[in-house]
């Protein structure tokens, strides 16, 4: 699937909760879970488009979940149905779902849930448990239960699910594969837990990006084989290859 640049119309742009929005575009898009698009709704400022993960896709539309964290995403959050938006993608390697089988744990935190919901939807032949951690109750995983065997929530304030961190009750030895996305400190812990139990883990890296096509090297990640670009060789990497910060 080759990336392409197109000008589309916003179908809907819904506020999911404080600071979190879901933007949808009508059309049929050939995408893989874990891939992303560059979104842009301005001409000059800010300079860069914004890399946003695919939250859902079907025969009718594609949806993106994003957090408002700066000028670019603030502009995106103000878009209305019918407004123009420029998109480039799909970008990145994504998850190869055909190679994942058996009992699977998806472990994610914060806005890192965005690519993992669409991943869960596509793991049709797997037995999936979905671990999601937040600071407080979140609506971003409201639709994931229909895709998984069990949804296991954790919140730091105890507003829903386990009070604490998403890794507290996670036992990697119970799974054939672990798939993870979220804050780097969380991913570091998940990788270490999986290494101790000899369970393969795939990590979807969240990195700042500029060009999205591998030219600028802004999004490089440290790996045991040297630096790799999250936008080209990633964002999905085998956890044992990465050098993460704890």
Curated annotation (Swiss-Prot):
Binding-site list for FAD: 50-53, 72-73
GO MF annotations, alphabetized: 2 iron, 2 sulfur cluster binding; electron transfer activity; flavin adenine dinucleotide binding; metal ion binding; oxidoreductase activity
Domain (FAD-binding FR-type) ranges: 3-97
PROSITE patterns from the UniProt entry: FAD_FR (PS51384)
Domain of life: Bacteria
Protein family per UniProt: Belongs to the PyrK family.
Function: Responsible for channeling the electrons from the oxidation of dihydroorotate from the FMN redox center in the PyrD type B subunit to the ultimate electron acceptor NAD(+).
Binding partners and assembly: Heterotetramer of 2 PyrK and 2 PyrD type B subunits.
Identification of the protein by name: Dihydroorotate dehydrogenase B (NAD(+)), electron transfer subunit
Highest classification ranks of the organism: Bacteria, Bacillati, Bacillota, Clostridia, Eubacteriales
């Amino acid at each position: 699937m080759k990336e392409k640049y197109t000008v589309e119309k916003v179908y809907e742009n819904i506020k999911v909760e404080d600071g979190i929005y879901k933007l949808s575009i009508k059309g049929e898009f050939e995408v893989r879970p874990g891939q992303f698009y560059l979104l842009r709704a301005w001409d000059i400022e800010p300079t860069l488009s914004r890399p946003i993960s695919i939250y859902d896709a079907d025969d009718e539309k594609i949806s993106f979940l994003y957090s408002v964290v700066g000028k670019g995403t603030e502009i995106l959050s103000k878009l209305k149905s019918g407004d123009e938006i420029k998109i480039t993608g799909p970008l990145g390697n994504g998850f190869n779902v055909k190679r994942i089988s058996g009992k699977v744990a998806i472990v994610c935190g914060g806005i890192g849930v965005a690519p993992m919901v669409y991943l869960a939807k596509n793991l049709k032949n797997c037995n999936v448990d979905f671990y999601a951690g937040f600071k407080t109750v979140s609506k971003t995983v409201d639709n994931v239960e229909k895709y998984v065997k069990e949804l296991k929530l954790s919140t730091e304030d105890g507003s829903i699910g386990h009070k604490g961190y998403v890794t507290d009750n996670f036992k990697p030895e119970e799974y054939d594969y672990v798939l993870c996305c979220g804050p780097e400190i969380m991913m570091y812990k998940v990788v270490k837990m999986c290494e101790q139990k000899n369970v393969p883990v795939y990590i979807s890296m969240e990195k700042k990006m500029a060009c999205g096509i591998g030219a600028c090297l802004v999004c490089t990640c440290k790996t045991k084989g040297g630096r790799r670009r999250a936008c080209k060789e990633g964002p999905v990497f085998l956890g044992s290859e990465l050098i993460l910060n704890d």
